């Protein structure tokens, strides 16, 4: 029994502490929720909501964005002036200094309010309401915090070459070049090769044959004679194809 009584008491104390902290927070304006309509109460199951403390109904709206995005709209909103006027009149009741941005290809409309409180009121009242036979949905637009109007430079990652930069960063160290891999055995074997000689790479075994490299001989005089003979040879003449005889139809 003691545990059953202590639980609600601790919960009420925690809620009261949170409410006091919210009231003491500087620069924060608190507004209560709009009362639920009869249809909404029926959807929620009905009942008396008087047991809810008014402090629990207060919500911090200071950090909410001042724009909403309307989705699932009828295509007539983007082409028909009368339908567009009806659509805008729904939101002008919450804010007179309101602007609209229509995105026909995305079938969405961005509604810009003068303050976040009007945007929150419109979202609470018009979200999932029927307009022109379709259920309209409202979402808060994402806010962008731009510190500077200039494009920020890219991060200097992986921009340092092996040579030291003009102003090395803290902790930069010179990278040593790797030692090239040289096969001295192969160079020694190639140096011992001569024209007309052969070199045995692998000796034969009982199960494998030997691998022998034969160096091709090069006769410089013979190559020069072949080149001179190729130059003396007459170039073949390309004979063009003869055009077929043409007889006009009116003369045939």
UniProtKB/Swiss-Prot annotation:
Similarity annotation: Belongs to the RCAN family.
PTM-bearing positions, type Phosphoserine: 163, 167, 218
Gene3D superfamilies for the chain: 3.30.70.330
Keyword annotations: Phosphoprotein
Compositional bias (Acidic residues): 219-228
Induction section of the entry: By calcium.
CDD domains: RRM_RCAN1
Domain of life: Eukaryota
Region (Disordered) location: 219-252
Tissue specificity annotation: Highly expressed heart, brain and skeletal muscle. Also expressed in all other tissues.
Outcome following mutation: residue 167 to A: Loss of phosphorylation, no loss of interaction with PPP3CA and PPP3R1, reduced ability to inhibit calcineurin and increased protein half-life; alone or
Gene Ontology cellular component terms for the protein in this record: cytoplasm; nucleus
Free-text description of this protein's post-translational modifications in UniProt: Phosphorylation increases its ability to inhibit calcineurin and decreases protein half-life.
The protein's name in its UniProt record: Calcipressin-1
Keyword Phosphoprotein annotated: yes
SUPFAM superfamilies: RNA-binding domain, RBD (SSF54928)
Keyword match Phosphoprotein: yes
Biological processes per GO annotation: calcineurin-NFAT signaling cascade; calcium-mediated signaling; locomotion involved in locomotory behavior; negative regulation of calcineurin-NFAT signaling cascade; negative regulation of smooth muscle cell differentiation; response to estrogen; response to ischemia; response to mechanical stimulus
Signal peptide limits: none
Entry function: Inhibits calcineurin-dependent transcriptional responses by binding to the catalytic domain of calcineurin A. Could play a role during central nervous system development.
Self-association and partners: Interacts with RAF1. Interacts with PPP3CA and PPP3R1.
